[in-house]
Every structure is written in structure tokens, then in C-alpha cells.
Amino acid sequence: MSLHSKKEQIQTLREQGFVVVPGLVSPERCDELKRIAQRQLQEAAAPIEFEADLQYPGAPSSKDAPGGHTVRRLLDAYGRHPAFAQWATAPEIRGWMELYFGEEPRLSRAHHNCMMTKHPAYGSLTGWHRDVRYWSFERDDLMSVWLAVGPETVDNGALWFVPQSHGAAFTSDRFDEAKFFRTDLAENDAAIRTAVSPELKTGDVVFFHCNTLHSAGKNLSDQVKFSLVFTYHGASNVPLPGTRSAAKPEIAF
């Protein structure tokens, strides 16, 4: 990526709340990341989160139900394997984040920091939400980086985004008790109808703001979908003491 194109990408992100950077990671590197994830998935290597733990729509009702041991996320990706950590702190990520935040970036180990796995049949639907709902920092200015380890389409549960929603001042009554954006309100429905789902090829990366409304559908294909996801913030935007956001040491580049 040239500096000029980075600036254009960041401008798009500031305006829309997300931006797709095509082909940022080589297919060969993605294949390596996928092989590691498949092996760890097969081993059920801890720490992991099961679909049954969250009870999102379409998830098994319990770990004893059919599909009850379907994995949703391989947690603490940074600590799971050096290949994951190398991508999380890659020079191209540092350069992008420095340009966006205007200061040294930090990698949060408390949020995302996972290999997302979306399985056929038991992979759940994720409702509309802002990631910042459970995050506690001095400022609501964090950036998530979503690497498509394989192709992502509507058919296999790709992300949907509501453009420009990161700047919208939604009142609390627009969200339910779990802080999902309510789908039973006409005013919310009007926003949701503007949503787009960018089709991602292997190695494409989505940068999106923590206030951008997004969701993801079910995986209707016959293959597990893998996405490596990390979250970053500027060094001056510190997690609030005593909160989940401060529960794990952060990574300086």
C-alpha cells in the first residue's frame, strides 16, 4: 500500500465507518493461518468459546444439545501461535494505525484477539451491534481489523455494515438490554435497510470503527469460515481501570 492509498483508505473509513483493503495478505500466508486454525480447532485447544455459550440465534441450546461443542472463537489469538501474533503486529498494520490515530498504536488483548470460526448448521447469526457496547476506554475511538482467511460472502455468513453509523448519536432506547440494535423499531429498520455486505476474497482486510453498526448472518455453505480479528487503539486512549478492557496487558508495537 502506498502512503497515498492509505490516506484514501483512512478518509473512506472516517466517512463510512469501514473500509476494505483488498489483497493485504498473500494467499500463501492465509493458507498457513488457516492450517494452524484448523489444527487448533480439531484439538479444541483452549481457550475457546462455544456457540452454546452465547446463545445467539441459531446456536445450540446447550453443550449437550446436537452441535453443542461447535466452536465460535479460538480466543487469545495473539498468544495462540506466533503466526497470529506476527500478523497482529505486522509493519503494514502499525503504519496504518499510526496514520489513523496520529500516535503510537496499541493492540488490545482483551477484545476480539481471536480466530472467528463460523460453522455450517450450528454457526449462529449475530445481531446488529456496535463493538464498543462492552468496551471501556477513555474515548470511543478503537479500530478492528478483520482478515478474511478465506472468501467471505453472504452465503457463508459475511459481515454487514451500516454506512456512516459510527457517527450517529443513537439513544439508548434504540438498543435492547443486551445492547443489540432493535429490529422492531421503524427508525432502526430504516438504518438497517442501508446496510451493505462487502464480498471479501482471501487476504482482504476490513478496517472498521468500534461504533459502526454491523451484523453477520449464518453460514449456509458446507465449509467452516475463518476470520482473524484484532482491535487497536491509540496509546493515549487507555482502558478504564477495573474494567474488562483493562483485564489483560496490551501490546505495544
Go through each PLM region and give its residues.
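Glycine-rich nucleotide phosphate-binding loop and flanking beta-alpha elements
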Residues: 27, 134, 214
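Non-heme Fe(II)-dependent double-stranded beta-helix
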Residues: 2-15, 22-128, 174, 243, ...
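Short hydrophobic-aromatic micro-motifs
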Residues: 21, 145-147, 206-208
